Each structure stands twice: as structure tokens, then as C-alpha cells.
Amino acid sequence: ATNEHFKDKNSFFIPSSEMMYLLPNQVAVALSQAQSIPQADVRTKMQDAILYSLKSEILREKAETDCSRCLIDTSPFFSGGTHLVWHSTDALIVPVRTDQQSINSLNLLLKLFSSPASEFRRCMPSDGHMPKIQMVVLTHCGWSTRAGARNEPNQQTRMYIQQVLDIVSRNIQSFTTNDPTNHIVLLDDFLGSGRISSARSEPIELLHAGETMTIHRTKVEVNKSVEKVKNQLRFISSCLW
């Protein structure tokens, strides 16, 4: 099916699959079998073929569709797929919500990258490829309502910004530059705009304040903050490409 909002663009979408739930076990079995091969050169070749299998498919698809960019949305629940994605990327974008559980998840991710004992580090491609993080997007940020305040995070958001900054600083080797401030961007809660965008499969860039839609018998509205969100998303895009 074609998304009408992308009809004039050279863009293609490859959906996920319920088979992704089986992939972690399949990848683990394949890597285990490859590691048991006695000939070192054959063993290395097989491991590289497995770890770079998704990258090979992406490069083939890009050539066939004449696309220059590829974005992959992955999840820790698809650990095998996530493992292959990490070896397919030039850089990672890590969304972190303004809550402690998300902060803990960021710490866990960076530990997976840095610890030699982690599942991810135990089996590496022969060229030693390690993914680098380009950006941590701190989502659902709140802003000060103090008179005269402009684009000033509220106290709770400032607390999470500081935590993320500390984490990035301690793990700067996992990022694409040596300056922690290059890698943290803030994003508002999308509110109704996000729900309508998802329901319609329509980019937020095309939404306008005042639009309404009924979702699960609840009336949802695009509020005025959508213009601020658009600017934030444009800035994030400019930092990526």
C-alpha cells in the first residue's frame, strides 16, 4: 500500500513482522554454530556474514530503490534484530523519556556497548565495528511557566537533562564526537498531534492547530504546540543529515 503523504517522494517502507520474536533465538543459534567451526578463516567469514546480514540487505535495497538514506526503528524486545541493526548503522538515535526508568535504560544500553562481558560484545565482527550514538533525544520535556521565561525547561526536566548529560559525559567514547553537549536535544510531548499523526500515518509537519479526529471514541485535537514540535523535529533532522 502507498502512503499518500509520500506519493511524490522516493520513499519506501518495510514493515516489521511477528517473526521478529523468533529472531533472537535464531541469531544466537547461528552464531553458536559459526563459532564451532574449526577453521579460523571460515569461522570469521561466517560470523561476519551473520552479523552484517541486515546491512547487506539494506545496501541491496538502497541500490535497487535508488535511496540514499535509511532509518531503522528497532526495539530491545527484538534483541536479535537489534543486534543486527547496531551493526548496520552509521549512527544511533536514542529516545529517552523524562522518567527514571528511561534513564536506567540509557545506562543499560551504554553498559552493553562498553562491557566486554555483555552479550553484544561477546561476538564481534572481524573489523571490530562498534555503533556510535549521534543523538539522545529527551522526550516529553516540560517548560517553565514563570513570567518572562522563554524556552526554559522546568525543574523536573532540568533534573533529567543533568542526569543525561552526566551519563553521556561518562560514556563519551560511545558517541560520535567528544563534546557531550553535541548529543542531547529536547522534544516536547506531542499530545494530540502525536496520536493523530499515528492514526493517519501522516507526518506531524502536515498537521495544523485545530484539526480534530475521533480515536477510540475520544475526540483528539491538534493544539497550538504543534508548531513548536515541528521546529524541534526540523532541528533534529538537520543534526542528522
Name these PLM-found stretches.
Residues 1-7, 12-72, 78:
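Cytosolic-facing regulatory segments adjacent to core modules
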Residues 42-54, 101-109, 225-240:
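Phosphate/oxyanion-binding active-site loops and adjacent basic polyanion-contact surfaces
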Residues 48-174:
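Conserved catalytic-core segment of NTP-binding enzymes
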Residues 123-241:
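C-terminal lobe/tail of nucleotide-utilizing enzymes
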Residues 1, 9, 56, 64-76, ...:
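Aromatic-enriched hydrophobic runs in primary sequence
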